[in-house]
Regions:
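Beta-loop-alpha module in the N-terminal Rossmann-like domain of NAD(P)-dependent dehydrogenases
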Residues: 48-97
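N-terminal Rossmann-like dinucleotide-binding module
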Residues: 1-48
């Protein structure tokens, strides 16, 4: 099985759990996590120093090395982020609901 490179948008309530699970999953590499709050990216850097913290979801969506995007942001942002990721050829997982 080949490796899949993942980017996560949102490191608030569910983001840390999603990152942890994909980080520990075989054949997965979490390359980047996007969050607009610097304090959340600081926590990410302490817990997962090998993962790049970025400020916007667009940085993840436009990254040619990322195969799949997890959208773990407030519900009202899901459609726009998922649509943009799909239009850029990414696989998408949207955190419920």
């Amino acid at each position: 099985m080949s490796n899949i490179t993942i980017g996560v948008i949102g490191y608030g309530y569910w983001g840390p759990n999603i990152v942890r699970n994909f980080f520990n999953a075989p054949n997965c590499t979490v390359k980047a996590v996007a969050d607009g709050r610097p304090e959340r990216l600081a926590v990410l850097a302490k817990v997962f120093p090998s993962i790049n913290g970025v400020k916007t979801g667009d940085e993840i969506i436009n990254d040619k090395e990322i195969d799949a995007v997890v959208v773990a942001t407030p519900v009202y942002t899901h459609f726009a982020l998922a649509k943009k990721a799909l239009e850029n050829g990414k696989h998408v997982l949207i955190e419920k609901p």
